[in-house]
Amino acid sequence: MKFFIFTCLLAVALAKHKMEHVSSSEEPINIFQEIYKQEKNMAIHPRKEKLCTTSCEEVVRNANEEEYSIRSSSEESAEVAPEEIKITVDDKHYQKALNEINQFYQKFPQYLQYPYQGPIVLNPWDQVKRNAGPFTPTVNREQLSTSEENSKKTIDMESTEVFTKKTKLTEEEKNRLNFLKKISQYYQKFAWPQYLKTVDQHQKAMKPWTQPKTNAIPYVRYL
């Protein structure tokens, strides 16, 4: 009886030892399997994470690029708008200045015609006539020189003719000459421009006995 109890206890102890050994041998296998699964998951998940990170980075980059392009375009438009406004304002001022200059020069030739339309004495027996021709201040030097030479020649010829004939002036002619002298003295008071004097003096057809004092050509009247 004791022997039977001893064998049962021994069998139970051996069975427990075997179960513990099997459980102990299964535990490393389970641990190894779990570690393998974790490693496999770690090997798979990083790829997914990398793919997610790369795709997210691309999306973020695209979004940043779009935002940067929008900001740059808005800044450029904001910079261009004031420049365009400044250009338009400058153009307006420039156009106003041009219009004022054009209006001034449109009035300027008409202003020059008035002093030139003064009385011109042609002959002592003629009446005072008013010249209404347009004024051209540009006169060539060659024309002036030729006109001076021609006027000197005509004066010399007419003076010689007058002295050869030795004509006597009547009282009416003397009165007319005095009247012309008064007119010339009256117009000497005005400060005429020099170029108007030269042009006006060379365009007059004067006689030696009707020579005014304002003439630039020297003339001595012999009695």
Curated annotation (Swiss-Prot):
Pfam families xrefs: Casein
Phosphoserine: modified positions: S23, S24, S25, S72, S73, S74, S77, S145, S147, S151, S159
Signal peptide: 1-15
Keywords: Milk protein, Phosphoprotein, Repeat, Secreted, Signal
Tissue distribution of the protein: Mammary gland specific. Secreted in milk.
GO MF annotation list: protein homodimerization activity; zymogen binding
Subcellular localization(s) per the UniProt record: Secreted
Any GO CC annotation of this UniProt entry: extracellular space
Entry keyword Secreted: yes
Major location (coarse): secreted
Similarity comment: Belongs to the alpha-casein family.
Function summary: Important role in the capacity of milk to transport calcium phosphate.
Protein name according to UniProt: Alpha-S2-casein
Native organism: Capra hircus
